[in-house]
UniProtKB/Swiss-Prot annotation:
Transmembrane segments: none annotated. The keyword Repeat applies. One of its GO terms (molecular function) is intramolecular transferase activity. The active site is at residue 483. PANTHER family: LANOSTEROL SYNTHASE, TERPENE CYCLASE/MUTASE FAMILY MEMBER. Disulfide bonds: none annotated. The gene is LCC. This is Pre-alpha-onocerin synthase LCC. Keywords: Isomerase, Repeat. It catalyses: (3S,22S)-2,3:22,23-diepoxysqualene = pre-alpha-onocerin. It comes from the Eukaryota. Oxidosqualene cyclase involved in the biosynthesis of alpha-onocerin, a triterpenoid characterized by a symmetrical structure due to cyclizations at both termini of dioxidosqualene that inhibits acetylcholinesterase. Catalyzes the first half of the cyclization, exclusively from dioxidosqualene. PFTB repeats lie at residues 96-138, 146-187, 438-491, 512-554, 589-629, 638-679, 700-747.
């Protein structure tokens, strides 16, 4: 039986805080009672049966374990509201109490709330390909792991036989080829799978032009595996790191994720690495192409991309640059004396890789970077200590649910969901009942704050300050993010206002000042705040490096969400520490406020980049402006945003937004006009912050009715459509958002409606 292990290490792992936040799924053959096994199998069978209607898993395996460990207590009787006019404070309070008890019961012993953070279908295949070519697949992944990965891939196959970019999207060549290849590497035969699953996948591939039409990132990984030729891959010369730093096209000017994904890819490309050509690799060459492998025109294949995968058109200048590099510079760099330049470039890249690894404990900033860097270490030396240390961190990225095992978008979202969850608990204003929960959460938040800048030459390696910030997941991950830092600061200040005996030790003033320093360092000249680092390049550089599949991969722009979080944190800080960097903080708030107003769309909405989508953007846009001192009556931006939200409210009283809003940049309702708990909660929070209760509370009552009636018998909330997003087309899972935001919205509703 599978067990989730929290805050446990293993020999060879470096850590800064005793592995606090680390979450690892381990298979224990003899663990569990027959009843527990039956519960797990029932959850798996139910998901598989309903997989085409309900794509999101509900983290049932994790919840079964934690509810038992934390001795989940009986709940008050569940209230139901027939009409919004019948809402009483008692109904709201009872719903909150039930939700809080459930939420407390799924908190880990180190204070964070674990949860699924996957959703992207191309991550697990990259890991499996890397482990296969390095010969580590069966060493790192037991048969139990491999079986759960097979379960995951089959569960998320579309009815047409293909796989989408995320668990809800239409089938794409990228993820259909990747999933098919991965299943073959996981020892599935070409005719295996229920109802001919493998055959239907292969048929989808061939009917849509074959793997020759996979987008560029797919071509790269297939070349690594040996089922694509490097001559059919866009050039990624490591020499680009020798360009003058001031050039906008220098990759050091890219956003941190793009930079640290491209870095190892240039090394792998420069080495033209190909894994062992096994009988399975040879078989795949004959299975996924519509013509014989040896007759493929690889030069022509280099620019091909299936229409299902082409979210964005690549500009002519990019095609011209790639063609020039392929035909002119690459031949020079592969032969003497140009090969000496390549040798130096490869040495520089691998040195940078080792520097990053040592400073960030071999966790990696994200899954694609992690896997690519791990492969680089093996290419340099298969027996290296670096590669061995990377293998020890693979399981940090794996998550298990009733739909199977998958690779997550980070090594988790522990810090993010913990600070959001803590704010939700505080919003309920039932502190006496949440004492233990708040103590544990503060302990996690305190131990996760970054306390050092690392041993890095910030200019040479394109780094910024880290000390005082908070990461998305764990301290060992170590990358500070503006909104995680801002929300962490907000929570630290809010907890400090509670009685000392309730939460125990508090975060020091010096650490709070360090956090403010990190936040202020991330404000761009346009007044907005980036996520990881300042915006360095120009928008035209984005076009030059455009991917067919992903949006905004080059520049870390200013975002409405990050800007709003930073405004709210700085305002809260300024109220308590009135003299610390006073003028600088006031200027930062005013500039960020103007930025939020400047990027509002004509219809009154804001595009939410980090979640789906316009409801998320509206919540941050409104709350940021309100925190800065704006009001509905004096701010046209707030009025327009409220009008926008109210225009999208469904007849049921809720809101429900499709992930297509993120892809198409246009508000799209869920199918059949369904309401979504999370979108309803975000919209309710935004309207409450704007003062809607004083103007017309009816829309609020209707939304609150949805949240009350959606609660499940055990105090949980249902998993619905996917809510996380990045790069416009990449949707990610946050299974705890339904709990967190339902609690926060009902807590604020209760306060504004019954206690104002």
């Amino acid at each position: 039986m599978w067990k989730l292990k929290i805050a446990e290490g293993s020999p060879g792992l470096d850590t800064l805080n005793d592995h606090v936040g680390r979450q690892i799924w381990c298979y224990e053959k003899d663990a569990g009672t027959p009843e527990e096994h039956a519960e797990v199998e029932e959850a798996r069978a139910k998901f598989t049966e309903q997989r085409h209607e309900q794509r999101q898993s509900a983290d049932i395996l994790m919840k079964l374990q934690l509810l038992k460990e934390n001795s989940f207590s009986p709940l008050p009787t569940q209230p139901k509201v027939d009409r919004f006019e019948d809402i009483t404070e008692d109904a709201v309070q009872t719903t909150l109490r039930r939700a809080l008890r459930f939420f407390a019961a799924i908190q880990a012993h180190d204070g964070h709330w674990p949860g699924d953070h996957a959703g992207l279908m191309f991550l697990t295949p990259c890991l499996v390909i890397c482990l296969y070519v390095t010969g580590a697949l069966n060493t790192v992944l037991s048969e139990a792991h491999r079986q759960e990965m097979r379960r995951y891939l089959y569960n998320h196959q579309n009815k047409d036989g293909g796989w989408g970019l995320n668990i809800e999207s239409h089938s794409t060549m990228f993820c259909t080829v990747f999933s098919y290849v991965t299943l073959r590497l996981l020892e599935e035969g070409p005719h295996d799978g229920d109802e001919g699953a493998m055959e239907s996948a292969r048929l989808w591939i061939l009917d849509h032009g074959g793997a020759i039409a996979i987008p560029s990132w797919g071509k790269f990984w297939l070349a690594v595996l040996g089922v694509f030729e490097w001559s059919g891959v866009h050039p990624m010369p490591p020499e680009i790191w020798f360009l003058p730093h001031f050039l906008p096209i220098h990759p050091g000017q890219m956003n941190i994720h793009g930079k640290l994904i491209l870095l190892p890819m240039t090394y792998i490309y420069g080495r033209q690495f190909v894994g062992p050509i096994t009988s399975l690799v040879k078989a795949l060459r004959g299975e996924i192409f519509s013509t014989h492998y040896n007759t493929i025109d690889w030069q022509e294949a280099r620019t091909m991309c299936a229409k299902e995968d082409r979210y964005y058109s690549t500009p002519f200048v990019q095609d011209l640059a790639f063609t020039f590099a392929k035909q002119c510079t690459e031949p020079l760099l592969r032969s003497w004396p140009g090969s000496l330049v390549r040798k130096k470039a490869l040495e520089r890249v691998i040195k940078w890789i080792h520097t990053e690894d040592k400073n960030f404990r071999y966790v990696g900033i994200g899954p694609l970077s992690k896997v690519s860097v791990m492969l680089c270490c093996w290419i340099e030396d298969p027996n290296s200590e670096a590669f061995k240390r990377h293998l020890l961190r693979v399981h940090d990225y794996l998550w298990l649910a009733e739909d199977g095992m998958k690779m997550q978008g980070y090594n988790g979202c522990q810090m993010w969901e913990t600070v959001l969850g803590t704010q939700a608990v505080l919003s309920a204003r039932m502190h006496d009942e949440c004492n233990s929960m708040l103590r544990k959460a503060e302990d996690y938040i305190s131990k996760t704050q970054i306390q050092e800048d690392g041993n890095l030459d910030t200019k040479l390696w394109y780094h910024k300050i880290s000390k005082g910030g908070w990461p998305h997941s764990t301290r060992d991950h170590g990358w500070p993010i503006s909104d995680c830092s801002a929300e962490g600061l907000k929570v630290a200040l809010a907890l400090a206002d509670l009685p000392w005996a309730m939460t125990g030790s508090q975060i020091s003033e010096e650490n709070l000042f360090d956090c403010v320093n990190v936040i202020l360092s991330l404000q761009n000249p346009d007044g907005g705040f980036s996520a990881f680092e300042l915006k360095r390049a120009y928008p035209w550089a984005e076009k030059l490096l455009q991917s067919e599949t992903f949006g905004d991969i080059t520049i870390d722009y200013s975002w409405v969400e990050c800007s709003s979080s930073c405004i709210q944190a700085l305002v809260a800080f300024k109220k308590k520490y009135t003299t610390h960097r006073k003028e600088e903080i006031c200027r930062a708030i005013n500039r960020a406020c103007r930025f939020i107003e400047s990027i509002q769309r004509k219809d009154g909405s804001w595009y939410g980049y980090w979640a789906v989508c316009f409801t998320y953007g509206a919540w941050f846009g409104i709350t940021g402006l309100v925190a800065a001192g704006k009001s509905f009556h004096e701010s046209e931006a707030i009025r327009r945003a409220c009008d926008f939200l109210l225009s999208k409210q469904l007849p049921s009283g809720g809101w429900g937004e499709s992930y297509l809003s993120s892809e198409n940049e246009e508000y799209t309702h869920l199918k059949h006009g369904r309401a979504h708990v999370v979108h309803t909660a975000w919209s309710l929070l935004a309207l409450l912050a704007s003062g809607q209760a004083e103007r017309d509370p009816v829309p609020l009552h209707r939304a609150a009715t949805i949240l009350i009636n959606s609660q499940l018998e055990n105090g949980d909330y249902p998993q619905q459509e996917i809510v996380g997003a990045i790069h416009k087309t990449c949707m990610t899972t946050y299974t705890l958002f339904c709990n967190i935001f339902a609690i926060q919205a009902l807590g604020e509703y209760r306060q504004k409606i019954f206690h104002s």
